[in-house]
Amino acid sequence: MKHYLLAAPLLALALPLPASAKTLTVAAGPDAQTRLQEALILAEPGDEVVLGAGRFVLIDGISLDVDRVTVRGAGMDTTVLDFTGQRDAGEGFRVTSDGVTLRDFAVENPKGDGIKSKGADDIVYHRIRVTWTNGPAATNGAYGIYPVESTGVLIDAVTVSGASDAGIYVGQSRAITVRNSVAEANVAGIEIENSRDALVERNFVTRNTGGILVFDLPGLPVMGGGNVLVRDNLVVANTTPNFAPPGNIVAGVRRGTGILVMANDGVWVEHNTLYDNPTAPIMVVAYTQGFDDARYNPYPRNVTIGANRVDRGGTDPQLDGAAQLLAAFGGALPPVLWDGLAQPGATALRVEPGLAGWSLNLTEQGKGLGEANPGPLNVPTPDRTAMLTGVGAPAALEARLHP
């Protein structure tokens, strides 16, 4: 027995100890492509890849598939990953691992998406900038910040401009926070698509075609979007002409749309400031096209428009019969537009008393606006007992903002 007792601590000493986290530093300059990708490959869980100040000229996309790695630059205006000469058409930076933190650097002019994270749970984007420096163009990449198929997404203090689909896009994901960010001169500023438990707050969304979009679309592996809270955002002057490539779903977004909710269940929109969104400050609609996916519900359900501050909206609607509509409503359309479509037996929309609205009074989903019969909005008031719960990224992600 004594021999066994002595052997146990000796055996423990012989076992390999976990390696301590290390820092891999990469400077800008010659061979940055090779040195940066090598660091991302050699990184181990818990490591930090530190990017120095300067411009990293990259000709191919880079990727990370190691869990719990932090990639940190010297600042979104100081460390720049420059993909202007990118040879392939993929994303600039691709992440496929869990627990990753991306912070304090910029991505410029990728041929495809800026940063795409797929199946990457508990990811943090902090003080990241993605820019297409030539301004709005259909040839720009589709998405700036693009997490998809993930649980636990925190996007904080990022800036995106020039995306030909959405600046900040979160798709087929759960437990999401998008906050304190700037989305400017994209087709859609912020888009939450086929996702649940999302919090979109304190963002500045301006000069896009449409400001904040909450969509649910058919034909995707994950559907049933909802439980989304959109609050305390500044949604201003979303007046950029639509520059999405033909065929994209956002190519149908009308210039001058502030907040658009389509085919979601349980969306609460309140305490936002909407100014100079000339088609509609707030729009709630069913899916606009035909579909053959039996799993899909095309109608908005349980959407609540609470108290929002709205000014100078609906003054130049990009809608058929705009002149007649403006005349009927005294020169500007009311702040809330509903297409009038609802799932039988369900409440599509509730609106705060005193916030005027109007309905297209459509009678059939997917048939366009030809049968519209506009009239005043007549819907119930908000039910405060049904306030949303369980929205936002996990609290554990917050600690990674302040290491």
Task: Describe each model-derived feature in a short phrase.
Residues A74-D77, D98-N109, D121-N134, T151-S164, ...:
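Right-handed parallel beta-helix
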Residues L17-A21:
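Sec/Tat signal peptide C-region and signal peptidase I cleavage site
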Residues A7-P16:
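Bacterial N-terminal signal peptides
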Residues K22-T34, E48, R68-G112:
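Right-handed parallel beta-helix/beta-spiral solenoid domain characteristic of secreted/periplasmic
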Residues K22, D47, G54, D60, ...:
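The right-handed parallel beta-helix/beta-solenoid scaffold, focusing on the short coil/turn
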Residues L36-L42, V57-V66, V71, K116-G119, ...:
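Short, T/G/N/S-enriched strand-turn elements that build extracellular solenoid repeat scaffolds
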Residues R295-P403:
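Acidic, glycine- and Ser/Thr-rich low-complexity intrinsically disordered tracts
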Residues Q33-Q37, I59, F83-F93, N109-K116, ...:
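Extracellular beta-strand/beta-solenoid scaffold signature
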